[in-house]
Swiss-Prot record:
InterPro entries: ATP_F1_dsu/esu_C_sf (IPR036794), ATP_synth_F1_dsu/esu (IPR001469), ATP_synth_F1_dsu/esu_N (IPR020546), ATP_synth_F1_esu_C (IPR020547), ATPsynth_dsu/esu_N (IPR036771)
NCBIfam families for the chain: ATP_synt_epsi, PRK00571.1-3
A GO molecular-function descriptor: ATP binding
Example of a GO cellular component annotation carried by this entry: proton-transporting ATP synthase complex
Protein name per the record: ATP synthase epsilon chain
Pfam family, one: ATP-synt_DE
Family: Belongs to the ATPase epsilon chain family.
Location in or out of the cell: Cell membrane
Major site of localization recorded for this protein: membrane
Disulfide bond entries: none
Stretches that traverse the bilayer: none
PANTHER family linked: ATP SYNTHASE DELTA/EPSILON CHAIN (PTHR13822), ATP SYNTHASE EPSILON CHAIN, CHLOROPLASTIC (PTHR13822:SF10)
Domain of life of the organism encoding this protein: Bacteria
Organism, as annotated: Streptococcus agalactiae serotype V (strain ATCC BAA-611 / 2603 V/R)
Amino acid sequence: MAQLTVQVVTPDGIRYDHHASLITVRTPDGEMGILPGHINLIAPLNVHQMKINRSHQEGVDWVAVNGGIIEVNEDQVTIVADSAERARDIDLNRAERAKERAERALEKAQTTQNIDEMRRAEVALRRAINRISVGKK
């Protein structure tokens, strides 16, 4: 049976490297499923969870991906992101604290009507919520 080779790469190194039968990611155009034999492509990714179905009996892996790009070339899938964490590596307490900090920063930015700070806080909040969601899987 054909399989994908999936790598998730960040500036800190390879965060995930395994074979898969299906991966699901979120792009600005919506959710995308990649199966073996998928057409070659490069696409931007949203801050979202990535679902990796390993072979039939091996289960599912979840990775919190904070944006980046996906490249599919033959049956090699490479995700390049600023940061990414596997569900098993996420410290939920730390993620909850990051969410609280982002909420406070967003509230302050809204009060002062600082658009740049508001955008930064919104991104930080999305990332924290994504990490919490994946960490609970």
